[in-house]
Design a protein with these regions (language model features):
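Short helix-to-coil transition segments within interhelical loops
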Residues: 55, 91, 175-205, 232, ...
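Membrane-interface interhelical loops and short amphipathic "cap" helices
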Residues: 48-62, 228-230, 236-250, 325-337, ...
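Glycine-rich helix-loop "coupling/hinge" segments at transmembrane-helix boundaries
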Residues: 221-246, 497-526
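Feature of multi-pass inner-membrane transport and sensor proteins
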Residues: 2-7, 132, 179-180, 195, ...
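Internal metal/ion-chelating core segments
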Residues: 188-194, 198-281, 286
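Membrane-topology segments of multi-pass transport proteins
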Residues: 1-20, 51-53, 134-139, 247, ...
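Short, charged juxtamembrane terminal tails flanking transmembrane helices
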Residues: 3, 549-552
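Membrane-water interface segments at the C-terminal ends of transmembrane alpha-helices
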Residues: 16-47, 57-176, 204-224, 252-271, ...
Length: 552
């Protein structure tokens, strides 16, 4: 009896449309999804189920506060971003040129840094209240009324002026892309500037504004430093309380799942809005709206409306921190600051390189696959960017701690040598969290760049005897270098600014710039937090300048 021919692994993979690159893409997908799957598993099968207790006590309050904060900041950012985008896109006035990119500068400052600066400026012992007491002869806080600084409205205020550039960026592009035809018709019917904005410009830009507002709300849910400093109890602060104070990982995972449900809803809203954005340029003839010159009082009003968000979101926080830094120059040589700076540069650089490398490999592997399965998995990996850092912290620490302990126990039994915790006891866990959190940035940049390369170039390289790796190195990468470089910068900047995941995953006595700022500000030592904050702002400005350059 003749035996059937032996099927080799490569032949089996080819049968299903897979190859080595495709398998690497699947491995990367699995690594990105591990934290999310861990959170879901731990929430469904907790060691100690405190869900009924959470449901009857703190969860409703956490949820109400989170939704209220999310909606308030989303609406505030939508108003600020839309008004400034309309003025920049449709009018010419003194200062409009530099305000066009200056309106992006608040993105350089993490919201928690802006919160620390605002409190320092406006608190009872701050310069504003001190000046008021001196001016009017007031002696104590009972002699006058002043808004409570560490409060829910203050958190909304800070987050709004830190995050509005997301709306501004998308709305400005939408207003610019609108055809002049509808605007000309409205003018011929005698409609004024406000009527044209309200009846034509705003409805056409609504999908872009909704997409920007959804991103703002996702960032609001992710925020920890601001709400923690203002004592606003949200779902994110609840994760820290339940896990670190109560020691219940299952309860923290259940709260994390609630956050994920909110995030999935927001992502769906953002995706739906982006799909509707395609109606902007359906006309075969397209001419942009010509800008109107504003002079006199109208020009001053337009300048003021556009300059105010820059002053609140960037100038004031930077000035407060700069004043502290200049008055405490010795803090710049503080060993703790230098160590935190080196830690930040190391983990952010490693994470950026790994993330972008993995993004390129995954996109290339998916493109080489003849099966549709890997292509369907590609959008799933972007969930890490939507998931808050606190959620990823829960999903990463638990499996890594389990692996660390098993590995250490096994090596101890075999060799009698204690290797310690090689993942959770070092910065490896932080780097992994950064890679998962910002993988979507690298993947999106690689996918867009690779999509612009003609398949004929790759086919020509293969016909000349180049293998898949050589084709990637000699054809794709040189043509993708600009996008890859931008992705490296954006991932690096986001890693420097990331706070929640770093707080949960850092080893003992390990600080990055973000955690050092949070630590010192929590102790009311803003003078010690100022140099680290300014380092973060300088790095963030690189990303803001890149966005300004790529969105001219």
């Amino acid at each position: 009896m003749q035996s059937s021919p032996k099927v080799l692994p490569k032949q089996q993979m080819a049968k299903f449309g897979f190859n080595g690159w495709t398998l690497w893409a699947l491995y990367i997908t699995g690594l990105v999804m591990v934290p999310i799957l861990t959170v879901a598993t731990l929430a469904l099968f907790p060691t100690e189920n405190i869900w009924p207790h959470l449901l009857n006590t703190t969860l409703p309050r956490y949820f109400r506060t989170t939704v209220s904060l999310m909606v308030s900041v989303g609406l505030g950012a939508a108003v600020v971003g839309t008004v400034t985008a309309w003025l920049i896109a449709r009018y010419r006035f003194v200062g409009a040129g530099w305000l066009e990119w200056a309106l992006l500068m608040p993105l350089a400052i993490p919201a928690y840094v802006g919160a620390y600066a605002l409190v320092d400026l406006l608190e009872y012992a701050g310069p504003v209240q001190t000046a008021l007491r001196g001016m009017f002869g007031w002696e104590t806080a009972r002699d006058y009324w002043f808004p409570e600084i560490r409060s829910f409205p203050a958190a909304c205020f800070v987050l709004t002026f830190a995050l509005y550039p997301y709306v501004y960026l998308l709305a400005r592009a939408a207003f610019r892309d609108q055809s002049s035809a509808s605007d000309d018709v409205a003018k011929s019917l005698g409609r004024g500037a406000f009527a044209r904005f309200w009846r034509i410009g705003l409805p056409l830009a609504r999908p872009a504004i909704a997409a920007g507002a959804a991103i703002v709300m996702m960032e609001t849910v992710n925020d920890f430093g601001t709400v923690d400093y203002f004592a606003v109890q949200t779902l994110t602060t609840g994760i820290f309380s339940v896990w670190l104070q109560s020691g219940n990982a299952g309860g923290a995972a259940q709260l994390a799942c609630v956050i994920l449900a909110v995030i999935i809803l927001l992502v769906s809203l953002e995706k739906s809005a982006r799909r509707r954005m395609k109606f902007f340029n359906l006309s075969t003839w397209h001419r942009g709206v010509e800008k109107t010159q504003l002079t006199g009082r109208r020009g001053v009003i337009a300048f003021t409306l556009c300059a105010l968000p820059v002053v609140i979101g960037f100038v004031i926080p930077t000035s407060v921190l700069g004043w502290h830094a200049l008055n405490h120059l010795d803090e710049w040589t503080n060993p703790a600051l230098i160590k935190a700076l080196l830690n930040t540069l190391r983990v952010a650089t490693i994470a950026a390189l790994i993330t972008v490398f993995a993004g390129v490999v995954m996109v290339y592997g998916v493109r080489l696959a003849r099966s549709e399965t890997p292509k369907r998995l590609l959008p799933i990996t972007s969930i890490g960017y939507a998931a808050p850092g606190a959620v990823l912290g829960v999903g990463i620490l638990i499996p890594l701690a389990w692996f660390d302990n098993r590995l250490a126990d096994g090596i101890w039994e075999l060799t009698g040598h204690d290797i310690g915790l090689i993942l959770t006891g070092t910065s490896a866990a932080i780097i992994y969290a950064y890679c998962v959190r910002f993988f979507a940035i690298a993947q999106g940049a690689a996918d867009a760049a690779m999509g612009r390369v003609s398949p004929n170039l790759a086919n020509a390289a293969r016909s000349l005897g180049r293998n898949r790796l050589q084709t990637l190195k000699e054809v794709y990468l040189p043509l993708m270098s600009g996008s890859v470089g931008s992705a490296l910068l954006l991932v690096f900047v986001d890693c420097v600014k990331e706070l929640p995941a770093t707080l949960l995953l850092r080893p003992f006595n390990y600080n990055t710039l973000a955690t050092l700022v949070h630590e010192q500000a929590s102790l009311e030592n803003l003078s010690q937090a100022a140099p680290a904050s300014l380092y973060i702002i300088c790095v963030g400005l690189l990303a803001a300048l890149l966005l300004a350059k790529t969105n001219k």
